[in-house]
Swiss-Prot record:
Its cofactor is (R)-lipoate. Signal peptide: none annotated. Binds 1 lipoyl cofactor covalently. One of its GO terms (cellular component) is glycine cleavage complex. This is Glycine cleavage system H protein. InterPro entries: 2-oxoA_DH_lipoyl-BS (IPR003016), Biotin_lipoyl (IPR000089), GCV_H (IPR002930), GCV_H/Fam206 (IPR033753), GCV_H_sub (IPR017453), Single_hybrid_motif (IPR011053). The lineage of its organism: Bacteria, Pseudomonadati, Pseudomonadota, Gammaproteobacteria, Enterobacterales. It comes from Salmonella paratyphi B (strain ATCC BAA-1250 / SPB7). Keywords: Lipoyl. Gene3D superfamilies: 2.40.50.100. Residues 24-106 form the Lipoyl-binding domain. Belongs to the GcvH family. The glycine cleavage system catalyzes the degradation of glycine. The H protein shuttles the methylamine group of glycine from the P protein to the T protein.
């Protein structure tokens, strides 16, 4: 079973979301998603300053197996991207919840968080796959 940290929120598309002290949210893909994709070779990051809507594809993770869109779990403005992934995309594999984060977003509608899954619900989703 994949590691599913209890403090995070999850999308059905296997993104995770963590609220930061400054009120922004850090987004990445789950351990389960990176296991399915395999070794990362490139991550196409979104533009800082871009405005996205929940469900928009805003980044792409390319692995040895496939390219997979990464979706915005909430609407808002992209305020930072993980530039370390340009040289070290494998961080998504080795540290999916720490060094392998993909972007940070300032949510424009925090009520959208209610549609995300908690760890228990995400684990149940994984069991059904």
């Amino acid at each position: 079973m994949s590691n599913v940290p209890a403090e995070l929120k999850y999308s059905k598309e296997h993104e995770w979301l963590r609220k930061e002290a400054d009120g922004t949210y850090t987004v990445g893909i789950t351990e389960h998603a990176q296991e399915l994709l395999g070794d990362m070779v490139f991550v196409d990051l979104p533009e800082v300053g871009a405005t996205v809507s929940a469900g928009d594809d805003c980044a792409v993770a390319e692995s040895v197996k496939a390219a997979s869109d990464i979706y915005a779990p909430v609407s808002g403005e992209i305020v930072a991207v993980n530039d370390a992934l340009s040289d070290s995309p494998e961080l998504v594999n080795s540290e999916p919840y720490v060094g392998g984060w993909i972007f940070k977003i300032k949510a424009s509608d925090e009520s959208e968080l209610e549609s995300l899954l908690d760890a228990t619900a995400y684990e149940a989703l994984l069991e059904d796959e």
